[in-house]
Amino acid sequence: MINNIIRNQVVTHFADHACMAQATVSIPELDKLATNLQLADTNKDIFGQDRSKLKGIEASRYFSCDNCGRKIAGGRFAQHINKCLDRKRK
């Protein structure tokens, strides 16, 4: 994904520079190249893993709190640790 973003930026800047140098509005070859560089599958993260599966895996995983020792679901761990550390200070 990051490679595609970089390619899109390079092609865009190259097209802008070429248009200004030639005083033209558009270069069809570069437009075609930019169209071919579009992401084919937007449901994947930068490592090529499916986003919907990752959310389910992390939310169902349990973590143990080092402060109180309880096991907390991954989706609620940040909220728990915030309250748990706040209680310890009082």
Curated annotation (Swiss-Prot):
Q: Does the keyword Metal-binding apply?
A: yes
The entry's localization annotation reads: Nucleus
GO: which molecular function terms? transcription coactivator activity; zinc ion binding
Top-level taxonomic group:
Eukaryota
- Does the record's keyword annotation contain Zinc? yes
Cysteines engaged in disulfide bonds, as pairs: none
Sorted UniProt keywords? Activator, Chromatin regulator, Metal-binding, Nucleus, Transcription, Transcription regulation, Zinc, Zinc-finger
Name any one Pfam family assigned in the record. Answer: Sgf11
Which terms does the UniProt entry file under GO BP?
A: chromatin organization
Cellular component, GO annotation: DUBm complex; SAGA complex
The record's annotation in InterPro entries points to: SAGA_su_Sgf11
User: Domain comment, in the record's words?
Assistant: The long N-terminal helix forms part of the 'assembly lobe' of the SAGA deubiquitination module.
Record note on quaternary structure: Component of the 1.8 MDa SAGA transcription coactivator-HAT complex. SAGA is built of 5 distinct domains with specialized functions. Within the SAGA complex, SUS1, SGF11, SGF73 and UBP8 form an additional subcomplex of SAGA called the DUB module (deubiquitination module). Interacts directly with SGF73, SUS1 and UBP8.
Which HAMAP family does the record match to this protein? Sgf11 (MF_03047)
- Give a short account of what the protein does: Functions as a component of the transcription regulatory histone acetylation (HAT) complex SAGA. At the promoters, SAGA is required for recruitment of the basal transcription machinery. It influences RNA polymerase II transcriptional activity through different activities such as TBP interaction and promoter selectivity, interaction with transcription activators, and chromatin modification through histone acetylation and deubiquitination. SAGA acetylates nucleosomal histone H3 to some extent (to form H3K9ac, H3K14ac, H3K18ac and H3K23ac).
Q: What is this protein's name? A: SAGA-associated factor 11
- Report the source organism: Lodderomyces elongisporus (strain ATCC 11503 / CBS 2605 / JCM 1781 / NBRC 1676 / NRRL YB-4239)
